[in-house]
């Protein structure tokens, strides 16, 4: 006879894969005929984008493009600095253990290293190390037993736990082409030297069957001015974006985990508009939305019958019951003396955090490594541009509660604000890092489709036993093995605390 069960269905994530995979990509950039010959390379900025990926067994194929901004010197009477922008597609296959077809994957690429050379005045050789931040999630359909709907007594070990029950996961691409105006204080453009773009000010609003996501693309542009080819300026603009993502069954209990990744971005002068203060921007943003509910569930963790033989087959799956994220802000200040050449002006600066390594030990997160700060300088006499990279030592620690042996924890460095001020040949560097520590609570769930109730063969059960406690034993395991109850063991052996028994302790068992 089958035993009736009341079950609670759950959709959970399995333990996520979070890996940084580095890959070197080489590219030769040919200076077009419309540009003057290159005499020296000042700086090369590489911005990688992933537009598509294909998950295979043990590997992933990524496709996208690399945007190159080159600042170089020229030998010309009118000017000495020029800029060059080129974009090239790429396709790479990355090795990723435990990856399987059908997994949900997001990839956020960053450029970690750049090696460049000038074989001749019309050719620039660039070799860049791209670090692909790969996050893989796989969902599992699971369930837990709430109770048994039968007349016979069944001993149950109950557990109360909070689950992040996934209702729906959906990825959408926001793509747009629009004109943006530069602020009034910006001068007319002659040539763009460098662009940095990142997402900020994100928020969402929910409605009956959809959510509206929106935010800004913070764009920083370094450019040569139209009036003077030696004058280098910096301007920042915000490009707003928004989109509707359709979801089903949104309720008051619904919570959302939303991730944004820029898949493509470009900005250039609009040739159809006479003013040089109007730019045309094209962008593509991937937004990944996971809708879930926090369900507190009391369920049967283990069970047995003292008088019947319950036969069943079970499948054990490891899943993430819930994910807790802690946010920490770390501020770093460093004064560096005599670091700049004399007669130089600091025009721009940028921060690279890919050389900072997080380590998790017990309930402590330690950040070690260097924050690399890139400085764009201009000589006040020759007007020549130069680039200098300095290292700022990072050695920070902070405590995080909730990390255990059955947790999977990983750290993300997302906020990377920097401010550099110049005082002669000295600089003051202020760095603000926003750190997310994600803790996944892992759980092993025993999935049972059906339970068959049979007659118990008592011929192999002794009426009295003396059991010597071994390492890892609990009263529950002993009671289940000998078809008795915890209450009977406690009373027979005068046990004060049923949760505490000692190795070597003798337990009298009477059926």
Where are these regions (language model features)?
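Interfacial loop/beta elements and low-complexity acidic/Ser/Thr-rich segments
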Residues: 1-460
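Primarily a LysM-type cell-wall glycan-binding module
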Residues: 454-491, 496-509
């Amino acid at each position: 006879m089958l035993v009736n069960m009341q079950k609670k269905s759950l959709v959970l994530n399995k333990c996520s894969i979070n890996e940084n995979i580095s890959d070197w990509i080489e590219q030769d950039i040919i200076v077009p005929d419309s540009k003057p010959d290159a005499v020296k390379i000042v700086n090369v900025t590489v911005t990688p984008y992933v537009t598509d990926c294909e998950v295979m067994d043990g590997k992933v194929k990524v496709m996208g493009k690399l945007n190159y901004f080159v600042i170089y010197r020229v030998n010309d009477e009118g000017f000495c600095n020029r800029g060059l922008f080129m974009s090239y597609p790429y396709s790479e296959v990355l090795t990723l253990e435990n990856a399987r077809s059908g997994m949900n994957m997001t990839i956020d690429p960053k450029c970690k290293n750049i090696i460049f050379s000038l074989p001749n005045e019309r050719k620039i050789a660039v070799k860049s190390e791209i670090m692909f931040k790969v996050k893989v999630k796989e969902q599992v359909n699971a369930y837990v037993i709430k109770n048994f709907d039968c007349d016979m007594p069944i001993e149950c070990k109950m557990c109360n736990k909070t689950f992040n029950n996934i209702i729906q996961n959906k990825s959408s691409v926001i793509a747009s082409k629009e004109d943006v105006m530069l602020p009034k204080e910006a001068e007319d453009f002659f040539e763009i030297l460098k662009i940095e773009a990142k997402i900020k000010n994100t928020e969402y609003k929910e409605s009956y069957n959809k959510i509206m996501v929106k935010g800004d693309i913070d764009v920083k542009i370094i450019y040569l001015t139209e009036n003077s080819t030696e004058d280098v300026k910096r301007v920042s603009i915000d490009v707003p974006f928004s989109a509707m993502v359709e979801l089903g069954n949104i309720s008051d209990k619904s919570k959302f985990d939303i991730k944004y990744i820029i898949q493509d971005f470009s900005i250039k002068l609009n040739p159809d508009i006479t003013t040089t203060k109007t730019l045309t921007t094209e962008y593509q943003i991937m937004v990944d939305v996971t809708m879930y509910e926090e369900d507190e569930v009391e369920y049967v963790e283990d069970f047995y019958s003292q008088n019947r033989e319950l036969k069943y087959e079970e499948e054990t799956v490891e899943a993430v019951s819930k994910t807790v994220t802690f946010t920490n802000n770390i501020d770093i200040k460093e004064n560096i003396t005599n670091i700049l050449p004399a007669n130089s002006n600091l025009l721009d600066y940028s921060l690279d955090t890919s050389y900072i390594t997080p380590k998790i030990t017990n309930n402590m997160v330690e950040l070690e490594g260097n924050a690399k700060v890139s400085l764009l300088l201009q000589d006040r006499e020759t007007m020549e541009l130069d680039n200098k990279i300095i290292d700022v030592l990072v050695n920070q620690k902070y405590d995080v509660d909730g990390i255990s042996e059955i947790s999977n924890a990983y750290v993300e460095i997302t906020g990377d604000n920097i401010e550099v001020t110049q005082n002669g040949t000295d600089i003051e560097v202020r760095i603000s890092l926003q750190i997310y520590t994600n803790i996944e609570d892992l759980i092993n769930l025993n999935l049972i489709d059906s339970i068959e109730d049979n007659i118990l063969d008592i011929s192999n059960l002794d009426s009295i036993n003396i059991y010597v406690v071994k390492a890892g034993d609990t009263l529950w395991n002993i009671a289940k093995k000998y078809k008795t109850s915890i209450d009977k063991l406690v009373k027979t052996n005068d046990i004060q605390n049923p949760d505490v028994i000692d190795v070597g302790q003798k337990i009298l068992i009477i059926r």
